Regions:
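Alpha-helical scaffolding segments of alpha/beta enzyme cores, especially the outer helices
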Residues: 25-28, 77-84, 109-113, 118, ...
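Basic, nucleic-acid-binding surfaces and adjacent catalytic neighborhoods in DNA/RNA-processing proteins
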Residues: 214-216
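Short gly/ser/thr-rich secondary-structure transition/capping motifs
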Residues: 104-108, 151
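An N-terminally biased module of ancient metal coordination in phosphate/nucleic-acid-related enzymes
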Residues: 2-105, 114, 179, 186-190
Length: 221
C-alpha cells in the first residue's frame, strides 16, 4: 500500500519580503492542513531592487511597505530561528531549513557563495529578474509585446541554469505568465516549446528537480 505524505517545500515566512507571517504561525497553519513535511524557503535575491508596483492589469498603484524592503535575509539569524523550531514540532511534522535563491548570471559568484554559507537542507533556484527588472512590475513590460517579455524571461532562465548549479529544484518556471498582461489570455506553451524543452532537458541533465508550483490556481486556473 502507498502512503501519501503531504509536503510543502516552498514556504515563505516573515523573514521574506513578501510575507508577514511568523514562521511558527506558518508551520501551525500547514500542520492544521495535514502537511507533515515542511521546508521553510525564504527569499534571498542578491541585487534585487524593489520599486513601486502598479497592477499590470489595472494600472493602479499598490505601493506598500513591503515594496520598499529588499529580498535579502540574514542567513545566520534566519537559520538559527528555524532550527530552534524543529524540536518543538518533531512529533507533528518534519521541518527542514531551505532558501529560495534568485538566480542571476551577473551575481553568480555571490549567489554561489551564499548557497554555501549555511548547511541548507534544500535550495530552490528561481528567476525573478530579467535585465534588472522583475516581471512582477509593469515597468518590465513597457515597450515590449507580451510574447517578447515572455521570451526574454525564458532566455534569462536558460542562461541562469547554464551558469549556476547551486540549487536542488528549479522554481515556478511559469512565473512570467503569472504577471504578464492579462496573464494566461492568448498564452500557449506551444509558442515557447523549443526553449522550454531546452530548459527542462538541461535541468534533467544536471540532476535538478522541477517544482510543481500551484500558487496561481486561486486566481488563474
Amino acid at each position: 500500500a502507498f502512503i501519501m505524505i503531504k509536503s510543502d517545500f516552498h514556504v515563505h515566512t516573515s523573514f521574506s519580503t513578501d510575507s508577514d507571517t511568523p514562521a511558527r504561525e506558518q508551520i501551525e497553519a500547514l500542520i492544521n492542513k495535514g502537511i507533515t513535511e515542511i521546508c521553510i524557503t525564504d527569499h534571498h535575491d542578491i541585487g534585487y531592487t524593489a520599486m513601486e508596483k502598479a497592477d499590470v492589469n489595472t494600472s493602479e498603484s499598490t505601493n506598500t511597505n513591503i515594496e520598499s524592503r529588499p529580498f535579502r535575509i540574514n542567513p545566520f539569524a534566519y537559520y538559527e530561528a528555524i532550527l530552534g523550531l524543529i524540536p518543538e514540532y518533531s512529533d507533528r511534522a518534519r521541518i527542514s531549513i531551505g532558501v529560495e535563491l534568485g538566480l542571476r548570471t551577473d551575481y553568480h559568484h555571490s549567489i554561489e557563495d551564499f548557497a554555501e554559507v549555511c548547511a541548507w537542507d534544500f535550495i530552490i533556484g528561481s528567476t525573478h529578474v530579467v535585465n534588472g527588472l522583475d516581471p512582477y512590475y509593469p515597468q518590465y513590460w513597457e515597450g515590449k509585446s507580451k510574447q517578447q517579455g515572455i521570451m526574454e524571461y525564458y532566455d534569462a532562465t536558460l542562461a541562469n541554469i547554464r551558469k549556476l548549479d547551486c540549487f536542488d529544484v528549479y522554481g515556478h518556471i511559469d512565473y512570467i505568465v503569472r504577471y504578464a498582461p492579462n496573464q494566461r489570455e492568448n498564452y500557449s506553451i506551444l509558442d515557447y516549446k523549443d526553449i522550454i524543452d531546452e530548459i527542462l532537458k538541461l535541468l534533467i541533465q544536471n540532476g535538478k528537480g522541477i517544482e510543481c508550483n500551484t500558487a496561481d490556481r486561486k486566481s488563474v486556473v
